[in-house]
Amino acid sequence: MNIVKNELLYEGKAKKIYKTDDENTLYVVYKDSATAFNGEKKAEISGKGRLNNEISSLIFKHLHAKGINNHFIERISETEQLIKKVTIVPLEVVVRNVVAGSMSKRLGIPEGTELEQPIIEFYYKDDALGDPLITEDHIWLLKAATPEQVETIKSITTIVNEELQSIFDDCHVRLIDFKLEFGLDAEGQVLLADEISPDTCRLWDKETNEKLDKDLFRRNLGSLTDAYEEIFNRLGGIHHV
């Protein structure tokens, strides 16, 4: 696909988004920046952008092959990809299969507790408010999404959880929890967006429960790039990804 990168449209914590000569296509460059606690902790980690781009590209391609519509078009280089332009729904959708992180602190349930069924949580995307946990009633109040869009998002999220658990199970990795974002394309269709990587997923080794995700950075537990490289290598060994 011959697309020309134009001016910078938006720079976030982990990615730069550029306009292109096609109004419906955007150019994404993954950065080596690492942040945690709503930007309170920051670092530059060489190789992180490459690994997140490669892992996210692999996963989005797999999900597309399974019939799950998403914004990914193609990988351009180790750190770059093309995506469909969408209007982001201001919600972070978190799926929890095992208790960890903020859920453990909030509810007083020990980290590592298996959930009988996945729990879906919604967070309002607003840095100034600290991305608060909200209910579906709050979503209507904030006009963040319509009831129909929320039902579509929940349905897609459930399917994505099943697919991701299958992918990571084949890699001998436990999918503890993960964050999804969604957008609306030019026709108003809900599409899976943003990224799916160890930045947005909690991933533990199935045998040892070793953390292979951004908690290594959050909690100063070890090398982020070594863990991300391990996830990338395990995914690369799966024939269906």
Swiss-Prot record:
Q: Which GO terms describe its biological process?
A: 'de novo' IMP biosynthetic process; cobalamin biosynthetic process
Enzyme Commission number, as recorded: 6.3.2.6
Annotated metabolic or biological route of this protein: Purine metabolism; IMP biosynthesis via de novo pathway; 5-amino-1-(5-phospho-D-ribosyl)imidazole-4-carboxamide from 5-amino-1-(5-phospho-D-ribosyl)imidazole-4-carboxylate: step 1/2
Q: Which domain of life is it from?
A: Bacteria
**Which keywords annotate this record?**
ATP-binding, Ligase, Nucleotide-binding, Purine biosynthesis
Instruction: Read off the SUPFAM superfamilies from this record.
Output: SAICAR synthase-like (SSF56104)
**Family in the record:** Belongs to the SAICAR synthetase family.
Q: Which InterPro entries match?
A: SAICAR_synt/ADE2_N, SAICAR_synt_PurC, SAICAR_synth, SAICAR_synthetase, SAICAR_synthetase_CS
**Kind of enzyme, top EC level?**
ligase
What is this protein identified as?
Answer: Phosphoribosylaminoimidazole-succinocarboxamide synthase
GO MF annotation, one: ATP binding
Classification from the root reads:
Bacteria, Bacillati, Bacillota, Bacilli, Bacillales
